[in-house]
């Protein structure tokens, strides 16, 4: 009798393996961090072998620590850091270069040349995305142009491209499966989200040979079986989704207007828009939420590059505290209107500003400012940025979110969650199970494997641990937010992005 689903959650700084039971409860967790490589300013890389080995080890560790046998596991769901780009040899499976991570900004000049040439409207109309180094297409083009012999080998059909899910699937299946799902494909800037196919015009624009590309499947599908020697048996791989879409599924945001926000290294707010690919007038992204039985559900997304990374910087860079758990007590020492604003534009600004040249700053310092105020300002920045996204979504979509479901490491901080509810002016729901990204991948696998009849059954499993109700006066909320907007304007790099909301 199958008791568990194994979820592989391959993230930006660590790989995790989690076993879930049929009720969506966590039975066991294993996690392993891996090295980050910064070979030049603005460049971020991962060693693909580090990713692969960390995934294998965590899967084996969680089975060992829980005592789960291979016979008790129904199958595998997989979720991954999106956009991160790999290129490997089809014969050997060996990568030609380190993975270029979603945070990497090396293709900024090329992206600007595409914008200057007037391509952004065309690209957005096909992909729902903007021209930015964030997405996979320009990273893949860089690999083809800069790895010796790569373009020639690609033209001969010797190489394979994939995001992290595709690379792991290739490895797990012994090279038998070169595939991805529609959510990951929708983040490459090469996939037409309306036709649900790789787009020939985009491939031509970015100079990408079609022979490199994986097959695109539903998010719940037959992705093959793992080679028995990896985990002890030929487990079926039955669900794949990019991390933020997987979290949307894990939070059971299945109706149009339902929204979730994940607070990890970055912050990602996604609202379900149903069968309609809503176009943002505020520079948010239109993306695939999930594709099931050939039917596509769309979402609108705002991506904030720095959320939990601010806490890491305050801890490791400024050494203001020893452990992230100390931040709540520090923040509680401050008065509400302390006047300090921290804009964490360490790698530029994401949605809705999309200003890669912006840089971080702290405003409002006085002789009274201490560690507590700076820490509080860093935490509040995440909430202000979420308010930025909320304002855009409310303007773009009729069925806007009347409440927000949250997950990720930062949501365990009650002070942050209360300030978030106050700043948004809507209830904020924190679920009982915070491993929503991995849970979403497990649910997708469970649908394919017959564990769950439909999305309604999965929605019935969601449980709320605590709701944070807004309690701040409207006038105070708006006063604080105006201060944030002023700080944002001050860090923007170019006249073009100043005044853009």
Swiss-Prot record:
Q: Which residues bind ADP?
A: 12, 16, 265, 308, 409, 413
Q: Where, in this chain's numbering, is ATP bound?
A: 12-14, 265, 308, 312, 409
Report the top EC class in one word. transferase
Keywords linked to the UniProt accession: ATP-binding, Glycerol metabolism, Kinase, Nucleotide-binding, Transferase
Catalysed reactions, semicolon-separated: glycerol + ATP = sn-glycerol 3-phosphate + ADP + H(+)
Q: List the disulfide bonds.
A: none
Could you give a GO molecular-function term held by this entry?
Answer: glycerol kinase activity
- Single GO biological process annotation from the record: glycerol metabolic process
Q: Which EC numbers characterise this protein's activity in its record?
A: 2.7.1.30
A Pfam family it matches: FGGY_N
UniProt GO cellular component terms: cytosol
Pathway, per UniProt? Answer: Polyol metabolism; glycerol degradation via glycerol kinase pathway; sn-glycerol 3-phosphate from glycerol: step 1/1
For binding glycerol, which residues are annotated in this chain's numbering?
Answer: 82-83, 134, 243-244
- InterPro entries cross-referenced by the UniProt entry: ATPase_NBD, Carb_kinase_FGGY, Carb_kinase_FGGY_CS, FGGY_C, FGGY_N, Glycerol_kin
Binding positions for sn-glycerol 3-phosphate per the UniProt entry: 12, 82-83, 134, 243
State the activity regulation: Inhibited by fructose 1,6-bisphosphate (FBP).
Family of the protein in this entry: Belongs to the FGGY kinase family.
| General function of this protein | Key enzyme in the regulation of glycerol uptake and metabolism. Catalyzes the phosphorylation of glycerol to yield sn-glycerol 3-phosphate.
Q: Which PANTHER family match?
A: GLYCEROL KINASE, SUGAR KINASE
- UniProt-recorded name of the protein: Glycerol kinase
What species was this sequence derived from?
A: Chromohalobacter salexigens (strain ATCC BAA-138 / DSM 3043 / CIP 106854 / NCIMB 13768 / 1H11)
């Amino acid at each position: 009798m199958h008791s568990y689903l194994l979820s592989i959650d391959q993230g930006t700084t660590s790989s995790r393996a989690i076993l879930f039971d049929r009720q969506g409860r966590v039975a066991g967790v294993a996690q392993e961090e891996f090295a980050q490589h910064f070979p030049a300013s603005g460049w971020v890389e991962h060693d693909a072998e580090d990713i692969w080995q960390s995934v294998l080890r965590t899967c084996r560790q969680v089975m060992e620590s829980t005592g789960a046998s291979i016979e008790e596991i129904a199958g595998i769901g997989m979720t991954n850091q999106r956009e991160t780009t790999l290129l490997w040899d089809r014969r050997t499976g060996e990568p030609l270069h380190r993975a270029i991570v979603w945070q990497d900004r090396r293709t900024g000049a090329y992206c600007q040349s595409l914008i200057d040439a007037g391509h952004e409207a065309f690209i957005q109309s096909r992909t729902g995305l903007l021209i930015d180094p964030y997405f996979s297409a320009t990273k893949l083009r860089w690999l083809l142009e800069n790895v010796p012999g790569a373009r020639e080998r690609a033209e001969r059909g010797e190489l394979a491209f994939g995001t992290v899910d595709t690379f792991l699937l290739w490895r797990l299946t012994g090279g038998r499966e070169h595939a991805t799902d529609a959510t990951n494909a929708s983040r490459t800037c090469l996939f037409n989200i309306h036709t649900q196919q790789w787009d020939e015009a985009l491939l031509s624009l970015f100079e990408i040979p079609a022979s490199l590309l994986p097959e695109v499947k539903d998010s719940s599908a037959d992705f093959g079986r793992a080679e028995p020697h990896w985990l002890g048996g030929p487990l079926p791989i039955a669900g794949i989704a990019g991390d933020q879409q997987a979290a949307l599924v894990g939070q059971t945001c299945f109706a149009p207007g339902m929204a979730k926000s994940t607070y990890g290294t970055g912050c990602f707010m996604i609202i379900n828009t149903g069968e309609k690919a809503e176009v943002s007038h505020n520079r948010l992204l239109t993306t695939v939420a999930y594709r099931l039985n050939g039917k596509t559900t769309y979402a609108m997304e705002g991506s904030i590059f720095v959320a939990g990374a601010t806490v890491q910087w305050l801890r490791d860079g400024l050494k203001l505290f020893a452990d992230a758990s100390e931040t709540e007590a520090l923040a509680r020492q401050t008065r509400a209107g302390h006047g300090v604003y921290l804009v964490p534009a360490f790698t530029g600004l994401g949605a809705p500003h999309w200003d890669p040249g912006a840089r971080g700053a702290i405003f409002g310092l006085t002789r009274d400012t201490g560690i507590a105020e700076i820490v509080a300002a860093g935490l509040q920045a995440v909430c202000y940025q979420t308010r930025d996204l909320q304002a855009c979504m409310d303007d773009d979509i009729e069925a806007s979110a009347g409440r927000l479901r949250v997950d990720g490491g930062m949501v365990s901080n009650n002070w942050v969650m209360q300030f978030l509810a106050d700043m948004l002016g809507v209830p904020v729901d924190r679920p009982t199970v915070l491993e929503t990204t991995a849970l979403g991948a497990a649910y997708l696998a469970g649908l394919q494997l017959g564990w769950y009849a439909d999305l309604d059954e999965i929605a019935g499993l969601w449980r709320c641990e605590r709701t944070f109700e807004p309690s701040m006066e409207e006038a105070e909320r708006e006063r604080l937010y105006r201060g944030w907007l002023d700080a944002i304007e001050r860090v923007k790099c170019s006249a073009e992005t100043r005044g853009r909301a």
